[in-house]
């Protein structure tokens, strides 16, 4: 079955102290529901970003912050496995309501590992 990434977006000035107990409870309830349905493969919040870029001289430069400058950043991700894109969107819709943030859904295309010799 296909896997999907659900990425939740937060404003770049997000203050975690604004999360109330009701919202945290709804997020935990949704995670329990996903686990019970057998669709959740991973879920977690994300810390600060660091960007690495190759330089013309072959070196790699590391900078603080996300690669793209934007007013929003990815605050958390969930990986789910569903039979159809519509089913993934239905779970994402529940995520929008529980987390109170916009989300993006993308199918994950797995690259096969190297053949064992």
What annotation goes with each model-predicted range?
Residues 1-117:
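Conserved, structured core segments of small domains
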């Amino acid at each position: 079955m296909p896997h999907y990434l659900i990425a939740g977006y937060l404003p770049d000035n997000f203050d975690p102290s604004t999360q109330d107990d009701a919202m945290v409870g709804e997020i935990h309830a949704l995670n329990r529901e996903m686990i019970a349905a057998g669709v959740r493969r991973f879920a977690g919040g994300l810390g600060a970003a660091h960007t690495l870029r190759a330089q013309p001289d072959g070196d790699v430069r590391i900078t603080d912050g996300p690669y793209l400058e934007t007013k929003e950043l990815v605050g958390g991700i969930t990986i789910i496995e569903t039979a159809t894109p519509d089913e993934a969107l239905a779970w994402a819709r529940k995520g929008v309501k529980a987390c109170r943030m916009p989300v993006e859904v993308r199918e994950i295309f797995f690259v096969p590992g190297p053949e064992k010799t």
